[in-house]
Amino acid sequence: MANEFKFTDVGEGLHEGKVTEILKKVGDTIKVDEALFVVETDKVTTELPSPYAGVITAITTNVGDVVHIGQVMAVIDDGAGAAAPAAPQPVSAPAPAPTPTFTPTPAPVTTEPVVEEAGASVVGEIKVSNSVFPIFGVQPSAPQPTPAPVVQPTSAPTPTPAPASAAAPSGEETIAITTMRKAIAEAMVKSHENIPATILTFYVNATKLKQYRESVNGLALSKYNMKISFFAFFVKAIVNALKKFPVFNGRYDKERNLIVLNKDVNVGIAVDTPDGLIVPNIKQAQTKSVVDIAKDIVDLANRARSKQIKLPDLSKGTISVTNFGSLGAAFGTPIIKHPEMCIVATGNMEERVVRAEGGVAVHTILPLTIAADHRWVDGADVGRFGKEIAKQIEELIDLEVA
C-alpha cells in the first residue's frame, strides 16, 4: 500500500521549512521513526522521521526546496497492497482547446427559461445584451441567415502609466518581519486572546539556597564539570510543588470540555536567541535531579541559540518557566503558552535588610511571578501554589546536589 510522507508541523507555529538533506534514496527500505529528511526553519534544524515502514518508491522534493505543511515529500510502500505510485512528474499545462467562434445573432431581449439537455456538463443559454451565445454541452439551434455585423475599428487604448512608488516618509525606516517573528506573534496573540490570566507575585527568601549553592558548586565543578545555576534549583522546586498542585501541569481540552492532567512534567524553558524567543522543554522533569535539570537547561539553551533544536524538544510541553532575572528585571507579566495552564517567572535576586528575631538581617530575596489560566484556577489556587514553591526553595526540600 502506498503511503504519502507529508511535511507536518515542526512546532512553534512555523509552517514551512527548507530541505537541507535527503537521507535515503528511491528503492531504500525505511523503518518507522527512521529519519528521511533534514529540514531547516527559522527556529530549528530537525530530522523528519518516517511514520511508515517499507520501501521508498518516490521522493518528490529536492535539497534546497521549501516545503509547506501538508506537502507530499515521499511515497513509501508498506507491501500491504498495491505498489506505491511512481514519483509524480511535472505535468505540462495542456494546450488550450480551440475556442469556438460564434456569429452573434441579433435577437430581442428574452426572459425564456434555460433549457437543459441530458448528458450536458453545462447547460442552457446565456442572454447577453441582444445576442445569444451557446454554452458548451448544448447544441445551438441553427442560426438564421443574417448579415454579419460591421465592426468599427477602434484605436488602441493608451496605456495608463503605472503610479510611481511612494517614497518612504522622511525620518522612517522599515523592518522586514521574519518567519520566526511572525510565528512568535501568532503564538502570542493566540495565547492572549484565548487565556485570561490571573497573575500573582511572591517574595521568596532564598538565603539558605544561596548558601547551599555556594557550598556545593565546588563539588559540582569537580564531579560534573559545571556549576549549578540558581535557575536549575528554581525549576526543580516548581516541579516538586506540582506534586501537590497537579492542575498547574494540566491543559484545557476544548473539544471534550475538560481539564487534562499531564502525568509527565515537561518544563518549557524560555530561551532568548538572536532570532527571537524559543521554548524547548525538559522531558519528564519529575524524574530528574537538580544536576540533571541543570545539564538539560545548558544543553537546550545552547542548541536553541545555534539552531540545533530538534522537533521533540519543542513538542509536548506542559508548563513553562522564564527567568526575568537574567536581564536584571524583577517583575513582569509573562504570557501563558497555549494550551498550557501556567507559566512561572523568576526575577532578579537582591540582598535586602529584613526584620529577623527582634533585629535586622540581610536576606537574599527572589521575586517569583505566576500567571495561570483564570478560567480553570482562581487567584487563591495560584496563591497556594506559589507558597508551596516558596516553601520548597526556603526549606531546600529535595534540592540536594549529590
UniProtKB/Swiss-Prot annotation:
PANTHER family: DIHYDROLIPOAMIDE ACETYLTRANSFERASE COMPONENT OF PYRUVATE DEHYDROGENASE COMPLEX, LIPOAMIDE ACYLTRANSFERASE COMPONENT OF BRANCHED-CHAIN ALPHA-KETO ACID DEHYDROGENASE COMPLEX, MITOCHONDRIAL. Residues 82-110, 143-172 are annotated as: Disordered. Binds 1 lipoyl cofactor covalently. The keyword Kinase does not apply. The keyword rRNA processing does not apply. It comes from Mycoplasma pneumoniae (strain ATCC 29342 / M129 / Subtype 1) (Mycoplasmoides pneumoniae). Forms a 24-polypeptide structural core with octahedral symmetry. Its cofactor is (R)-lipoate. Residues 2-77 form the Lipoyl-binding domain. Its EC number is 2.3.1.12. InterPro entries: 2-oxoA_DH_lipoyl-BS, 2-oxoacid_DH_actylTfrase, 2-oxoacid_DH_E2_comp, Biotin_lipoyl, CAT-like_dom_sf, Single_hybrid_motif. One of its GO terms (molecular function) is lipoic acid binding. Keywords: Acyltransferase, Lipoyl, Transferase. It holds the Pfam family 2-oxoacid_dh. It is an enzyme of class 2 (transferase). The pyruvate dehydrogenase complex catalyzes the overall conversion of pyruvate to acetyl-CoA and CO(2). It contains multiple copies of three enzymatic components: pyruvate dehydrogenase (E1), dihydrolipoamide acetyltransferase (E2) and lipoamide dehydrogenase (E3). The modification N6-lipoyllysine is found at K43. The lineage of its organism: Bacteria, Bacillati, Mycoplasmatota, Mycoplasmoidales, Mycoplasmoidaceae. GO terms for cellular component: cell surface; cytosol; membrane. This is Dihydrolipoyllysine-residue acetyltransferase component of pyruvate dehydrogenase complex.
